[in-house]
């Protein structure tokens, strides 16, 4: 094991000498997908709770499709399927985009987490105490101001525990990136196994690194929950 770590630690952590690899790529995939998917989900969640069915239905359909199909299949559709379409082949921008395994992986991860996060945020919006909304209306808040100052801040705090689980799941989902030949942590572990024929060591090292990242994320979310959800915990009585 020591020999493998000494030889491959750089590739496992950030580079093989030619490109970024390993943990660096895994974190990059996670950050890109979570940030872009989260921002998009925030707007879709507002539409998801809309009383207008023409706004609500397309968003429901989007979340149904991406939550109802495996992420692995979605990645294969983007990476292997899209490039076979004539419209993609004939459009320079689309051609260049779907030719990249990294682009396809980020797209699949972003849309997948967006679908789940939309439902998390929508559920949190529905859970905002009605009294807060009525008070905002009584003060003459417009719909935009009410969402910006009252509903979204409360909803995001309510959604934090469920959203933290989604982020951890997305970290695990980045392991599918090797399917698109993206040199993430699992891809490097597979390459080490192919070179050394020591699968327990190769994948064991990868597992330890995933655990370290997961622990760091869980710790960050716990600190956030203690800070922003403290007022929501019942006070102790003596």
Label for each model-derived stretch:
Residues 1-238:
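Transmembrane alpha-helices and adjacent helix-loop boundaries
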């Amino acid at each position: 094991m020591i020999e493998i770590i000494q030889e491959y630690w750089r590739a496992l952590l950030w580079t093989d000498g030619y490109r970024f690899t390993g943990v660096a790529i895994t974190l990059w995939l996670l950050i890109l997908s979570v940030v872009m998917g989260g921002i998009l989900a925030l707007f879709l969640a507002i539409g998801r709770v809309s009383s207008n069915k023409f706004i609500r239905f397309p968003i429901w359909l989007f979340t149904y499709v991406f939550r109802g199909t495996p992420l692995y299949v979605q990645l294969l559709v983007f990476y292997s399927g899209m490039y076979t379409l004539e419209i993609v082949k004939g459009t320079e921008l689309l051609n260049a985009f779907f030719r990249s395994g990294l682009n396809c992986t980020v797209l699949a991860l972003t849309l997948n987490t967006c679908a789940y996060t939309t439902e998390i945020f929508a559920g949190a919006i529905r859970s905002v105490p009605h009294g807060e909304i009525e008070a905002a209306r009584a003060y003459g808040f417009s719909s935009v101001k009410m969402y910006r100052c009252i509903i979204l801040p409360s909803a995001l705090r309510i959604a934090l525990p469920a959203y933290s689980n989604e982020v951890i799941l997305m970290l695990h989902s980045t392991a599918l990136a090797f399917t698109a030949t993206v040199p993430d942590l699992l891809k490097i572990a597979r390459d080490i196994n192919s070179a050394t024929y020591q699968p327990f060591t190769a994948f064991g090292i990868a597992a330890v690194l995933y655990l370290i990242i997961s622990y760091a994320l869980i710790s960050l979310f716990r600190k956030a929950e203690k800070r922003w959800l403290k007022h929501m915990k019942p006070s102790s009585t003596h």
